[in-house]
Amino acid sequence: MQTATRLERMHGHLALDFTLKQQRTRLTVREHRPPLQVVRDFGLADGTSFVHLHNVAGGVLAGDQLTTTIKLAASTKAQLTTTSSTRIYRSDGEQIAYQQVQATLAEQSLLEYWPDTTIPFAESLYQQQTRIDLAADAGLCWWEFLAPGREAYGERFAYRQLRLDCDIYALGRPILLDRMRLQPSLQQLSNPLYFGKYSYLATGYICRVGWDAVQWKALEAELMAFAASQTKLGRCLWGVSCLAAHGLVIRGLSSNSRDLLATAFDYWRFAKQALYGTTPNLPRKIY
């Protein structure tokens, strides 16, 4: 019983610093407190540092407060992924499972974030806050994937509340303030105004500071054409929209998670070719 109580209130912290050494990005784990840790870090052929992030508790429990801080030095490139889905366990009271991510990208750096799906269990309460700061010519590919619950156990939108906030700043000014509040008991998420027949949600943010509005509109049109080709009513829906400056947002709804994960990478394939003239490294979870 004492162990369970202790697990319910973990204050985990992971601080990652990426620096450039001999034209390759190197990771320094400045701080780590359980349950957060780095399982593996290795270099890719183009000098990118590829990192697996792991929660040894298997998920986020009610009362947990977990913080991840990411700093990229100038001209570094990092790709982050998770070792498994993020499970949000049930709350027997009013304690919220909480995660915070803060990322700071220096000039000409590039961060790619490819997590597994977040799965909120029945009766769970979850809050996630993300803030990303971009310097001049910094680039970003950031995705979030959300499941309706444990469908194999008959859980679909059975959680109590889910809050997802994401703020992106470029050159000190906000370009995205994204707020999502899902409360199934009040919102009837199966209504067509919300998820309708679909169960899984993908949200992607693609940015590069310095591109002008004309360039972003051209990329938006290209990705919208791809979105139309991937939209299949009853199976998946996709949409793309420019931000106020320096980026765009992509959203997808699907009846399964596999379609979202694979198609998300295709969006980045188009975007990275346009933004950097290169082909992205395939996230290992899609192999």
Curated annotation (Swiss-Prot):
GO molecular function: nickel cation binding
Cystine pairings recorded for this chain: none
Subunit structure: UreD, UreF and UreG form a complex that acts as a GTP-hydrolysis-dependent molecular chaperone, activating the urease apoprotein by helping to assemble the nickel containing metallocenter of UreC. The UreE protein probably delivers the nickel.
Matching Pfam families: UreD
Keywords: Chaperone, Cytoplasm, Nickel insertion
Family: Belongs to the UreD family.
Naturally occurring in which organism (per UniProt): Herpetosiphon aurantiacus (strain ATCC 23779 / DSM 785 / 114-95)
GO CC entries: cytoplasm
Descriptive protein name: Urease accessory protein UreD
Localisation per UniProt entry: Cytoplasm
